[in-house]
Amino acid sequence: DVLGVTVEGKDLALYEVEGEIYATDDLCTHGAARMSDGYLEGREIECPLHQGRFDVCTGRALCAPVTENIKTYAVKIENLRVMIDLS
């Protein structure tokens, strides 16, 4: 599952992969597309605009046309709340 959220003015995409939550910037590094509108398969998110893919756990760009990694954020669950480190 993928969910777009805004935290302290920053647009993020949250992903559930094998019971863990991961977070990246919501904007693709290649084009103006929201990753939260993309297709998640395993730990890879496919950009809905040009079909480039990223590893949501590491942010690594996996295939053309994306060449720049996407920023990831540390996530932890506390008292059933998702806590994201924006630093």
UniProtKB/Swiss-Prot annotation:
Where along the chain is [2Fe-2S] cluster bound? C28, H30, C47, H50
InterPro entries cross-referenced by the UniProt entry: Rieske_2Fe-2S, Rieske_2Fe-2S_sf
Q: Which cofactor does it need?
A: [2Fe-2S] cluster
Pathway participation: Aromatic compound metabolism; naphthalene degradation
Write the record's keywords in alphabetical order, separated by commas.
2Fe-2S, Aromatic hydrocarbons catabolism, Electron transport, Iron, Iron-sulfur, Metal-binding, Plasmid, Transport
What detail does the entry give on cofactor binding?
Binds 1 [2Fe-2S] cluster per subunit.
Rieske domain boundaries: 1-84
> Might you name a Gene Ontology BP term for this protein?
catabolic process
Stored Gene3D superfamilies: Rieske [2Fe-2S] iron-sulphur domain
GO MF terms listed in the record are:
2 iron, 2 sulfur cluster binding; metal ion binding
Q: Which PROSITE patterns match?
A: RIESKE
Q: How does it assemble?
A: The naphthalene dioxygenase (NDO) multicomponent enzyme system is composed of an electron transfer component and a dioxygenase component (iron sulfur protein (ISP)). The electron transfer component is composed of a ferredoxin reductase (NdoR) and a ferredoxin (NdoA), and the dioxygenase component is formed of a heterohexamer (trimer of heterodimers) of three large alpha subunits (NdoB) and three small beta subunits (NdoC).
Give the matching PANTHER family: FERREDOXIN-RELATED, RIESKE DOMAIN-CONTAINING PROTEIN
Q: Which family does it belong to?
A: Belongs to the bacterial ring-hydroxylating dioxygenase ferredoxin component family.
What's this chain's function?
Component of the naphthalene dioxygenase (NDO) multicomponent enzyme system which catalyzes the incorporation of both atoms of molecular oxygen into naphthalene to form cis-(1R,2S)-dihydroxy-1,2-dihydronaphthalene. Functions as an intermediate electron transfer protein via a specific interaction with iron sulfur protein components (ISP) (NdoB and NdoC).
By what name is this protein known?
A: Naphthalene 1,2-dioxygenase system, ferredoxin component
Source lineage: Bacteria, Pseudomonadati, Pseudomonadota, Gammaproteobacteria, Pseudomonadales
